[in-house]
Amino acid sequence: MQVLKTIEELQNIRKNSLGKVGLVPTMGALHNGHISLIKQARNENDIVIVSIFVNPTQFLPGEDLDAYPRRDEADKKICQMCKVNYVFMPEISTMYTKEEVLVKAPNKSYILEGKTRPGHFDGVLQVVLKLFNLTQPTNAYFGKKDAQQLTLIQQMVKNFFLPINIVPCDIVREEDGLALSSRNIYLNPTQRKDALLISKSLYMAGSLISSGERSVKAVKDKIYEVMSILDVEYVAIVDKEFNELETIEPTNTIILVVARFGNTRLLDNIWL
């Protein structure tokens, strides 16, 4: 495994790479969710590149950029264990200049996550496009937990005619159902226990729909009821292009939940 720090190193490697290339973009602090993406990429490609870069442009003022967990040495060991070929770990000054041509996310980026974090998805798309241009992957792997981000990246690839296959990967959970997140380490024991109500509410919603419930309001009300002790930021029921639904479509629905635990935001969802 080789660790790359510069654009020149990465471009030279890519220029001489043959076969399928899989990219797994991350911000580090790798956990079993990331490992599942990396292992899938390893199974489906000749060369696997993992990027580790805490992207400043997707953080808003007052968010946890400086506090975001950084575990570079541990992350490199995980990548080596997963038989990654190249780890790209650039500095901010490598990825950004003072004058930048900007990527503007579409209107759907200003709902849900984007409503709470305006401009967040502009930064996400900016860095992902840079990584795509640098690595020119055959396949790029993203988790379904960040469902709105995944949908916007798919749209960017389509709009910019990028010859890249976006691979959506299932959410990985702890044994008790909590969706894996690098931010879970911020939770105290009480918050960690209460956070289980998020996945519990989603499982319950899925069960209701499996039993024939099609009312968006009825399902939302039940979710809020299960999470009544939590600081719920939003509950949304949308189709897979993030249009609001009047009636639940069992094979074309995503149910999303975000709750706050102090300064920590946790998001989760289920895809039907």
Curated annotation (Swiss-Prot):
Enzyme Commission number(s) from the entry: 6.3.2.1
Pathway(s) it belongs to: Cofactor biosynthesis; (R)-pantothenate biosynthesis; (R)-pantothenate from (R)-pantoate and beta-alanine: step 1/1
Chain coiled-coil ranges: none
Active site: H34
Keyword Lipoprotein: no
GO molecular function, a single term: pantoate-beta-alanine ligase activity
Annotated binding of (R)-pantoate, by residue: Q58, Q149
Source species, domain of life: Bacteria
Reactions it catalyzes: (R)-pantoate + beta-alanine + ATP = (R)-pantothenate + AMP + diphosphate + H(+)
Pfam families for the chain: Pantoate_ligase
Class of the enzyme per the UniProt entry, highest EC level: ligase
GO cellular component, one term: cytosol
Localisation per UniProt entry: Cytoplasm
Residue numbers binding ATP: 27-34, 143-146, 172, 180-183
Function: Catalyzes the condensation of pantoate with beta-alanine in an ATP-dependent reaction via a pantoyl-adenylate intermediate.
Misc note: The reaction proceeds by a bi uni uni bi ping pong mechanism.
Subunit structure: Homodimer.
UniProt cross-references to PANTHER family, sorted A to Z: CYTIDYLATE KINASE/PANTOATE-BETA-ALANINE LIGASE (PTHR21299), PANTOATE--BETA-ALANINE LIGASE (PTHR21299:SF1)
Protein name: Pantothenate synthetase
Organism expressing this protein natively: Aliarcobacter butzleri (strain RM4018) (Arcobacter butzleri)
